[in-house]
Swiss-Prot record:
Glycans are attached at S42, S48, N271, N312. This is Biglycan. The keyword Signal applies. One of its GO terms (biological process) is blood vessel remodeling. It is found in: Secreted, Extracellular space, Extracellular matrix. Disulfide bonds join C64-C70, C68-C77, C322-C355. Keywords: Disulfide bond, Extracellular matrix, Glycoprotein, Leucine-rich repeat, Proteoglycan, Repeat, Secreted, Signal.
Amino acid sequence: MCPLWLLTLLLALSQALPFEQKGFWDFTLDDGLLMMNDEEASGSDTTSGVPDLDSVTPTFSAMCPFGCHCHLRVVQCSDLGLKTVPKEISPDTTLLDLQNNDISELRKDDFKGLQHLYALVLVNNKISKIHEKAFSPLRKLQKLYISKNHLVEIPPNLPSSLVELRIHDNRIRKVPKGVFSGLRNMNCIEMGGNPLENSGFEPGAFDGLKLNYLRISEAKLTGIPKDLPETLNELHLDHNKIQAIELEDLLRYSKLYRLGLGHNQIRMIENGSLSFLPTLRELHLDNNKLSRVPAGLPDLKLLQVVYLHSNNITKVGINDFCPMGFGVKRAYYNGISLFNNPVPYWEVQPATFRCVTDRLAIQFGNYKK
């Protein structure tokens, strides 16, 4: 049975889900974490990435920092009021949880000998200073969660093995060119909740990255950044101050299948802007200041979900969502939200939603002046 402390850890870390929408239980069982010998499972010489927890015999290392809990290769030292990274951490540790402490600095040798570490959780500390070689021993680190700290810059010399970086809710104002140099494996960055403006991104700041997912929400952006990785599948820029989408703003991002622009101040989307997104499946434009349905939606053959609620839309035309003729759209809508708009829904023609899978997928009404 899973110990209570481990269950609490898993539940706590599953609050901020990455783009794959995986809970922390999946994350903990990822390749390289709670590994078991396949000999115990199938008799072969290879290892399994997802062990059968009922058949795993708990192993406790003789090295466990005072006050921490150590189980398998997980070291949990959260909520202890720690001022520094503890010593005596077993070198075979794959997950080190140090969240909710008072750590203010990461020193050169804090992670010395932890060459097998796969995930490092430093969320909700007071970290403002990181030695340039602090992460050097972490040659297998893939997940670094360092959100809710006092950082004013992206940490230098991040491990080249890094796949996922969560650095939201810090004090970062600038992303300089070269800060992500050498991070060829990185595919997910969460950096919302920082006071970033458009001018804070130096040209070439994301050069070399092949990201699938990027979130820069709750920042100070006034427009869509034009120099983000063109490999992006998901881009979330919600809760900013974006006022318009101009023709070439999305030109670079033709591989997007999910775009989040909710809770901005968007009044205008230039005609043709959305035509650069042929693979788009989900579009969030809720809580803006749009007065009409954006042009170009019928041409997005794979679009399935559109959030347009809480805008100023007063009219919905018969061809605003669906292309004329049958067989043109490759995927039908399964979600269109239009509630909290001043549109008289009783005047909308039924044929407007001829390419929607079910009438329950359409949300109208609840407008308040």
